[in-house]
């Protein structure tokens, strides 16, 4: 069985005709969520085929074949949408179509990386990536058993180097209690 990559999470229903909001977990929603796309469900279950897709007030709304009312849409709330890893392509593909590679990583590529500060101090290892509407956070498990939540933005995480097995964190004052 091929490895699955999560590309989205189904949110609340929108309207009465089966549309749902999507929490996007891919940098290429214009390629992943097109009409006719077949998306798996994390852990198995019947695949979902996109039969309609559009943006409304900054949110992606999808309609799936066979999901024709609010009740059916509500039953899908929280489902993680997946693709097979072999369908994903390289995370360094030209994701936005401008002819240049885009720097992005799959969650699975980040979990387990060693996290160090710009001064070389070990913070721990990446244990999870938390996706939220406000932005992504890296959960870093410390050697003392504690956990740091670090906003995954270039200003704070300037270096991500999976081949070297590390990320570099440049925390602003007050972000981490390092004393």
From Swiss-Prot:
Q: Which residues form the PRC barrel domain?
A: 102-175
Supply the Pfam families for this chain. Answer: PRC_RimM (PF24986), RimM (PF01782)
* Location of this chain's protein in the cell: Cytoplasm
Q: GO terms for CC? A: cytoplasm; ribosome
Q: What is its main location?
A: cytoplasm
Q: Which GO terms describe its molecular function?
A: ribosome binding
Keywords, ordered alphabetically: Chaperone, Cytoplasm, Ribosome biogenesis, rRNA processing
Looking at the keywords, is Signal present? no
Q: For this UniProt entry, which residues form the secretion signal?
A: none
Free-text comment on this protein's domains from its UniProt entry: The PRC barrel domain binds ribosomal protein uS19.
Give the similarity note. Answer: Belongs to the RimM family.
Q: What name goes with this protein?
A: Ribosome maturation factor RimM
What organism does the record attribute this protein to?
A: Frankia casuarinae (strain DSM 45818 / CECT 9043 / HFP020203 / CcI3)
